[in-house]
């Protein structure tokens, strides 16, 4: 049952907490600029789904779009039923293909399954090639002589990367809250900031998977912005951040150059994460499409921006930037259980429909970005959107928002707030519990295969046949034998 956030001793009224800050911090947190619209993966996923639905408003146009076009010729794969008629329906169907000058590559008939009284006795499978413009007319004519005409291409699997090197293709930026495009962006009127952003973004555009991430020489103003964000948030972490974040943050300060007067370099941080959990960073020029971003997680690759928020708005950014990535995401990705949780979301996204991408993006929003967890009888923050935003971190653990137990089915369809602070947060019993619930949710997503990440080849194994599954089981058996040997050695 939803409850107000009364689980933490530090919970208090949000406005009371803000009133205890100095005037500058309070103004920054409550200003319209701070609570302005934020970008998220959900917006992009929703746009992609709506675009797909618009394209599918006509069933025939949707079918035509699904078929492969080659030099103006449409390659069709069709299934249809043949009713018992005079003249035979097969003869009439072949006549349709002749009329539209189709080149038949394959034609096969088989008894309909299951055969019921009154149902057509035969099904027909046809693969053919016809001029693209005549596809709608051919379908219309075929439906007059056959039943249940459908295209096998309608259930085609969308492309997704199979090898880590193919992440070079996963760099599609969405229309974003950009200093060049949006009047409300704090950097819109700052030409120097806009040019700086373009210069840093070029690193991401030129990057190839496996290359060292080029260093950025940050300016004095950028470092000053980092210092204000770093020192302000660091003072709040001991009472508001989860244990895993605190432990990783201490290690990052000891071994990775995290400090007030220096912005960490992505290459150094990436090497640290690789040793801890196998995650790596990859430079990104801005907010990526939801499908591309989630696919990267499947390979334990986190697409990470290098530019920093504008100096006039240090307490908040409406888009991904390095304070959000380095202070919010990176410490959590250094935890093994949370890293696995993040990868599981990515694996669940591979090859699924736009509708499922939107749901997974919403799940990501309410967990990885704005998630809460229980620890030692208190509620703590683990979401990067909370841990990189002073005002939202205060708000999330105050008495104002509604706190609900984490349920992936509910979180995946929960309306989110991008105009101000979240009115609803989901709290997990533990990361392990959240991981188990996510895997249960992902197992119900409809796709004609399963996937498995191979950490040796950094590739995705598609489990779509008995042979592929047997091959995967061989690897599991090898690991089990090694563990059994280890148990024998210590017993």
UniProtKB/Swiss-Prot annotation:
Pfam families: Biopterin_H (PF00351), TH_ACT (PF21417), TOH_N (PF12549). It catalyses: (6R)-L-erythro-5,6,7,8-tetrahydrobiopterin + L-tyrosine + O2 = (4aS,6R)-4a-hydroxy-L-erythro-5,6,7,8-tetrahydrobiopterin + L-dopa. One of its GO terms (biological process) is hyaloid vascular plexus regression. Its cofactor is Fe(2+). SUPFAM superfamilies: ACT-like, Aromatic aminoacid monoxygenases, catalytic and oligomerization domains. It is an enzyme of class 1 (oxidoreductase). Homotetramer. Interacts (when phosphorylated at Ser-19) with YWHAG; one YWHAG dimer bounds to one TH tetramer and this interaction may influence the phosphorylation and dephosphorylation of other sites. Interacts with NT5DC2; the interaction results in reduced phosphorylation and decreased catalytic activity of TH. One of its GO terms (cellular component) is nucleus. One of its GO terms (molecular function) is tyrosine 3-monooxygenase activity. The record marks 418 as: Important for substrate specificity. The keyword Cell membrane does not apply. The modification Phosphoserine is found at residues 19, 31, 40, 465. PANTHER family: AROMATIC AMINO ACID HYDROXYLASE, TYROSINE 3-MONOOXYGENASE. This is Tyrosine 3-monooxygenase.
């Amino acid at each position: 049952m939803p409850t107000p956030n009364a689980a933490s001793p530090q919970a208090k009224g949000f406005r009371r907490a803000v009133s205890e800050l100095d005037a500058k911090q309070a103004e920054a947190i409550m200003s319209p600029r701070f609570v302005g619209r934020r970008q998220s993966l959900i917006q992009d996923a929703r746009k992609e789904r709506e675009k797909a639905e618009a394209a599918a408003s006509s069933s025939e146009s949707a079918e035509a779009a699904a078929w492969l076009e080659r030099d103006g010729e449409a390659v069709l794969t069709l299934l249809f039923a043949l009713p018992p008629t005079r003249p035979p329906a097969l003869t009439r169907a072949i006549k349709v293909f002749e009329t539209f000058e189709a080149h038949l590559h394959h034609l096969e008939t088989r008894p309909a399954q299951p055969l019921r009284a009154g149902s057509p006795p035969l099904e027909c499978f046809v693969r053919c090639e016809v001029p693209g413009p005549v596809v709608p007319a051919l379908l219309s004519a075929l439906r007059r002589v056959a039943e249940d005409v459908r295209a096998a291409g309608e259930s085609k699997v969308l492309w997704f990367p199979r090898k880590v090197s193919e992440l070079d293709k996963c760099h599609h930026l969405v229309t974003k809250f950009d200093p060049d495009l949006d009047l409300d962006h704090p950097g819109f009127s700052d030409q120097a900031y806009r040019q700086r952003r373009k210069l840093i973004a070029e690193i991401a555009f030129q990057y190839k998977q496996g290359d060292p991430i080029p260093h950025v020489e940050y300016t004095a103003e950028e470092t000053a912005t980092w210092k204000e964000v770093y020192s302000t948030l660091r003072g709040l972490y001991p009472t508001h951040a989860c244990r895993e974040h605190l432990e990783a943050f201490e290690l990052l300060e000891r071994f990775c150059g995290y400090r007030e007067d220096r912005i960490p370099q992505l290459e150094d941080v990436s090497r640290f994460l690789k040793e801890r959990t196998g995650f790596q960073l990859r430079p990104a020029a801005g907010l990526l499409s939801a499908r591309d971003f989630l696919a990267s997680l499947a390979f334990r690759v986190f697409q990470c921006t290098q530019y920093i928020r504008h100096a006039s708005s240090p307490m908040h950014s409406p888009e991904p930037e390095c304070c959000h990535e380095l202070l919010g995401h990176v410490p959590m990705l250094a935890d093994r259980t949370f890293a696995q949780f993040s990868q599981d979301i990515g694996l669940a996204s591979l090859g699924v429909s736009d509708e499922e991408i939107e749901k997974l993006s919403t799940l990501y929003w309410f967990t990885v970005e704005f998630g809460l967890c229980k620890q030692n009888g208190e509620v703590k923050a683990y979401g990067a959107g909370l841990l990189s935003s002073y005002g939202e971190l205060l708000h999330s653990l105050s008495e104002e928002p509604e706190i609900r137990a984490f349920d992936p089915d509910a979180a995946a369809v929960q309306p989110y707030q991008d105009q101000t602070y979240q009115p609803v947060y989901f709290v997990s019993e533990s990361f392990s519990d959240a991981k188990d619930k996510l895997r249960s949710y992902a197992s119900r997503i409809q796709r004609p295969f399963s996937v498995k990440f191979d950490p040796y080849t950094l590739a995705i194994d598609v489990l779509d046949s008995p042979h592929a599954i047997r091959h995967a089981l061989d690897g599991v058996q090898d690991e089990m034998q090694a563990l059994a040997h280890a148990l024998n050695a210590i017993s």
